[in-house]
Design a protein with these regions (language model features):
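Hydrophobic, well-ordered beta-alpha structural blocks that scaffold small-molecule cofactor pockets
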Residues: 7-143
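Conserved S-adenosyl-L-methionine
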Residues: 1-4
Length: 143
């Protein structure tokens, strides 16, 4: 045959010696589990939102890639934060699309008189250690 473009023709033939296995349909079981987990997720974020208001969170720590998704699920543009502190100097002065909060490079002065929410979910452990070491008030969103 004469082919034009970048196409390739491949033909397969099923081996007749292989027995067919029936797939078990776990859809209803999996669907229930997904719905249950999603409901728990929504409840957890609602509690976190209440905690943010109650504790008067006014800054974030950790300008990770997931911050916009985190903010989306919190149903906020993070305007309640004065800034997000990050250890990466290249991120200083940057902003996330559709979020109000500016990223600032780590400086001891930025930590005082602030109540932080850890915003880099993948960095909760090292950020918690750093803030604990300095006796800075913070909320771990994963607890």
């Amino acid at each position: 045959p004469n082919f034009w473009g970048g196409s390739i023709l491949i033909a397969f033939k099923k081996d007749s010696s292989i027995n067919e296995r029936k797939l078990i349909n776990n859809y209803t079981l999996i669907k229930k589990k997904i719905i249950k987990n999603y409901s728990r997720f929504k409840v957890k974020y609602k509690k976190l939102n209440n905690l943010i208001l109650k504790q008067k969170i006014n800054a974030g720590y950790g300008a990770g890639q997931m911050v916009p998704s985190f903010a989306y699920h919190l149903k906020t543009d993070l305007s309640f934060m004065d800034y997000i502190v990050d250890d990466n100097k290249k991120r200083a002065g940057e902003k996330y699309p559709f979020l109000k909060t500016e990223i600032k490079f780590f400086n001891e002065k930025l930590l005082f008189n602030k109540n932080f929410l850890i915003t880099a979910l993948d960095g909760v452990i090292p950020i918690s250690k750093k803030l604990n070491k300095r006796n800075i008030k913070f909320t771990n969103p994963l607890k």
